[in-house]
Amino acid sequence: MKIGVPKEIKPQETRIGLTPESVKTLVGEGHEVLVENNGGFEAGFENSHYTSAGAKIIDKAEDIFNDSEIIVKVKEPLLNEVKMIRENQILFTYLHLAAAKELTQGLINSKGVCIAYETVTDQNGGLPLLAPMSAVAGRMSIQEGAHCLEKNQGGEGLLLGGAPGVEGGTVVILGGGVVGENAAIIATGMQAKVHIVDKSEKRLEELTKKFGDKIIPQLSDNIDLKKLISEADLLVGGVLIPGAEAPKLVTKDMLKLMRRGSVIVDVAIDQGGCIETSKPTTHGDPTFIVDDVVHYCVANMPGGVPRTSTFALNKVTLPYLVKLANKGYQKALGEDKNFLAGLNVHKGHVTYKAVADVFGHEYVSAGEAIKN
């Protein structure tokens, strides 16, 4: 198959869909790989690295879309990219459609075969293609949040890790999944006071076993969330409902309870955010202030560390891409129900129920869709 890797064009998105090593693997399997000129430059990959791996360098994204059977990206296509997706063409990337009505309609109109990294599952119900980027975003949430607490960033002027004889700040993490766990790794390492809120008692027990008395586990049914966020210097939103819009856990009214100069990092923003006042921002202009609270809501946080992120992403996506290219999507998805869960849009039909429900589209099961 011909596999195309266009340059990412989302603002300040500098990752790329394939590393040169991944290209080498695909070429070794007998496939042709087209990479856009300088597509990997910001992630530290030169054109020469790709040509040495067997790729062809293409000057224009349009030519890659026109000539490829599979398009491999990192972030969801922007609307001018959606227009280039052809009927029956496979798109393999993050999509986050539950928070993107116009994109969803565009992909329906394209009649392409759209497989989302973030809804592919594993045998345990985990999200193996989302996990590495969630880990990166979770760790970055504390780094970025700590920076935003500085006075010249609009924060309260607090050093999150404290100083000799001076207590550090308080971090409240909503959600104990991959984002929350990785946020806690950095926050506890900085010696902040860390609360983790989750609805699962079992998950909190796992986190307590990992972190010991470095965290304060809080079962969501048993806490006064208003009181807890009023104590937070840094609030991290890391709640996820797979493939669906994130629940709004913190309302605008609750925001008024937070300290002046405190910080919110809403990692869930690519699924709509779990804070009512959140709105997507970019690495170029990452923050805004509402009611004296700094909001950091960059929708592609791992794009700020493209080299680490691209390697981490390829480590998990490549085996699935090899299956797609070697077997074709119908066989690859048909023999693996966990991979099939990644199919969100198929030839004009929405095949992921949470997306169909949120926008009122007719739902066609992925299993039925690939038979046609």
Describe each region flagged by the PLM:
Residues 6-7, 11-44, 152-240, 287:
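Glycine-rich phosphate/diphosphate-binding loop of Rossmann-like nucleotide-binding domains
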Residues 12-13, 21, 25-32, 45, ...:
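Metallocofactor- and cofactor-centric catalytic cores in central/energy metabolism, strongly enriched
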Residues 31, 86-89, 109-112, 259-262, ...:
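A short helix->loop->beta-strand "cap" motif at the edges of active sites that frequently abuts
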Residues 54-67, 218-229:
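Short acidic low-complexity segments
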Residues 66, 70-149:
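Phosphate/diphosphate ligand-binding glycine-rich loop within oxidoreductases
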Residues 69, 75-76, 95-96, 221, ...:
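Short glycine-/small-residue-rich Rossmann-like dinucleotide-binding loops
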Residues 118-159, 168, 269, 274-372:
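Adenosine-phosphate binding glycine-rich loop
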Residues 209-291:
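Rossmann-like adenosine-cofactor binding region
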